[in-house]
Design a protein with these regions (language model features):
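Secretory-pathway/membrane protein signature
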Residues: 1-201
Length: 201
């Protein structure tokens, strides 16, 4: 946005449509027992991004197989979390004492939000968790921007150059960040499933 983006530039009909959309979204979020996140869709997107990066890096000395396998493991946890979420929502409706089931729902909410925060900064930004990508930044539409950039740069450079080795180091660091985020997400999900499973017995 710029200083020229003043109120007179707004398409009032489109603005009203957006406001209605956001109002419905907020209403549903505020009235849901558990946040309506679909981690399976996130896992599928992550796997697709990693496969695309693997294709782009096929001539580079880097192996993305471990990341792809971890992303598939995360998808398995996400499927279990989705099933657990549905069980908790059903149990909450039927429960006469909603405190225990409500606590299980709170734990699932916390895990879902934590996992989404963990994965969002690696999947959607170049700047990372605490940085800021400018509005409309073209790289945010690329698969895992912080990994995409070093791969593209390395493909353009002479493998014997110093700059190539610097980008290779950057790539390995970014791949480690992605791996950490996926492993942390698996851990959050697995621990939550274990704890919630005990609550529902």
């Amino acid at each position: 946005h710029s200083e020229a983006d003043t109120i007179d530039k707004i398409d009032k009909d489109l603005f009203a449509k957006h406001l209605k959309f956001y109002a419905i979204l907020l209403f549903r979020l505020c009235n849901s027992l558990i946040v309506p996140y679909d981690l399976v869709a996130v896992a599928d997107e992550l796997i697709n991004h990693l496969n695309e990066l693997k294709r782009l890096a096929e001539n580079l000395p880097v192996n993305l197989e471990q990341l792809i396998e971890e992303a598939k493991s995360f998808k398995e946890v996400a499927i279990k979390l989705n099933a657990c979420k549905m069980r908790v929502e059903e149990a909450y409706v039927k429960a006469s004492d909603k405190s225990i089931v409500g606590e299980a729902a709170r734990m699932i909410n916390k895990a879902l939000i934590r996992i989404v925060h963990e994965l969002s900064h690696i999947m959607r930004t170049e700047a990372g968790r605490y940085g800021y990508d400018p509005y409309g930044y073209y790289l945010t539409g690329k698969p895992i921007p912080r990994v995409y950039i070093p791969i593209i740069k390395m493909n353009e450079l002479d493998p014997n150059s110093t700059e190539y080795r610097l980008w290779e180091t950057k790539l390995r660091r970014e791949l480690n960040r992605v791996l950490d985020a996926i492993e942390n997400s698996i851990d959050y999900g697995t621990m939550t499933l274990q704890i919630v499973g005990k609550c529902l017995v």
